[in-house]
């Protein structure tokens, strides 16, 4: 399974949480300390919990299960699409359409409509004989559907796992998954509720580098899991035991790094880091604000 190091997490700014006035008390056990009004996430726990989550995703992928990558905030959109495509999985990176999971039949009708419009547009003369205004309307409809559904149009039914960037922003997706018993793996910042997530990965869910790091590692877990599935006499235990020496060494370091040493390098990192942004701004490197939410193209109550 993919390895991840303390150095990678520090360089990506994974340890920067939200302002101390914006936090969820349930995240207390994952907090290392506080610096200049910003909570610092305990990367020791992030390392271990990422390893557990990645192993779970790899096991599911090895069993032929499908993973849906979800990240609609602006700084997550590109990484989510790229990594999901790389591991041949599915994604939602624009809008989470209400009822996407709980009213899948309705969403599939929209997907069917998208494929009809794509087929029409791909054939020369597909719009022949139609008024110009109608052609413009159909193209507008096709582009709108493609923007919202392109990442799931080939998904064969409900996903088996959700990988989520920011469980707060994607709260509707998390609730729908929980209602259907679909496991949720999520990057959970200091302002989130970890009880809503099955596999918690404590970390910065706003920094571009942190998002890309986690998305790429989860995609690696899917790729490696699928590769193991092709081996003869595969068992779930083999995922745990069949690691290359290099990977095994890294995972040993990841899980058993001395707590005092971990605290030391985190403290050194913080002392050398630049001062956090003023309280009115978000923390950490490469942070961006989320895009304003617009009304979804498909609206279902999710009942």
Curated annotation (Swiss-Prot):
The keyword Ribonucleoprotein applies. Residues 267-303 are annotated as: Disordered. InterPro entries: Ribosomal_uS2, Ribosomal_uS2_bac/mit/plastid, Ribosomal_uS2_CS, Ribosomal_uS2_flav_dom_sf. GO terms for molecular function: structural constituent of ribosome. One of its GO terms (biological process) is translation. Gene3D superfamilies: Glucose-6-phosphate isomerase like protein, domain 1, Helix hairpin bin. Signal peptide: none annotated. SUPFAM superfamilies: Ribosomal protein S2. Keywords: Ribonucleoprotein, Ribosomal protein. GO terms for cellular component: cytosolic small ribosomal subunit. PANTHER family: 30S RIBOSOMAL PROTEIN S2 PROKARYOTIC AND ORGANELLAR, SMALL RIBOSOMAL SUBUNIT PROTEIN US2M. Belongs to the universal ribosomal protein uS2 family. This is Small ribosomal subunit protein uS2. The gene is rpsB.
């Amino acid at each position: 399974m993919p390895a991840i190091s303390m150095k990678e997490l520090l360089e990506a700014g994974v340890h920067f949480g939200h302002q101390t006035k914006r936090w969820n008390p349930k995240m207390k056990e994952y907090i290392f300390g506080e610096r200049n009004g910003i909570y610092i996430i305990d990367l020791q726990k992030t390392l271990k919990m990422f390893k557990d989550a990645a192993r779970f995703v790899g096991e599911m992928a090895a069993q032929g299960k499908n993973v849906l990558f979800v990240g609609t905030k602006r700084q997550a959109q590109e990484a989510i699409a790229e990594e999901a495509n790389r591991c041949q999985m599915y994604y939602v990176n624009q809008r989470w359409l209400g009822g996407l999971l709980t009213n899948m039949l309705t969403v599939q009708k929209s997907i069917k409509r998208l494929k009809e419009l794509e087929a029409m547009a791909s054939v020369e003369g597909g719009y022949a004989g139609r008024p110009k205004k109608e052609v413009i309307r159909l193209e507008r409809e096709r582009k709108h559907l493609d923007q919202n559904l392109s990442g799931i149009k080939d998904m064969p039914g409900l996903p088996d796992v959700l990988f989520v960037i920011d469980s707060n922003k994607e709260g509707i997706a998390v609730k729908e998954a929980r209602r259907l018993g679909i496991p949720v793996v999520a990057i959970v910042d200091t302002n989130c509720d970890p009880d809503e997530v099955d596999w918690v990965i404590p970390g910065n869910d706003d920094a571009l580098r942190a998002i890309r790091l986690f998305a790429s590692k989860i995609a690696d877990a899917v790729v490696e899991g699928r590769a193991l599935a092709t081996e003869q006499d595969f068992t779930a235990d083999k995922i745990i035991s069949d690691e290359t020496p290099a990977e095994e060494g890294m995972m040993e370091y990841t899980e058993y790094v001395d707590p005092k040493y971990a605290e030391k390098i985190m403290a050194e990192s913080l002392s050398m880091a630049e001062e956090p942004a003023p309280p009115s701004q978000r923390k950490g490197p490469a942070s961006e604000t989320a895009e304003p939410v617009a009304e979804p193209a498909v609206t279902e109550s999710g009942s």
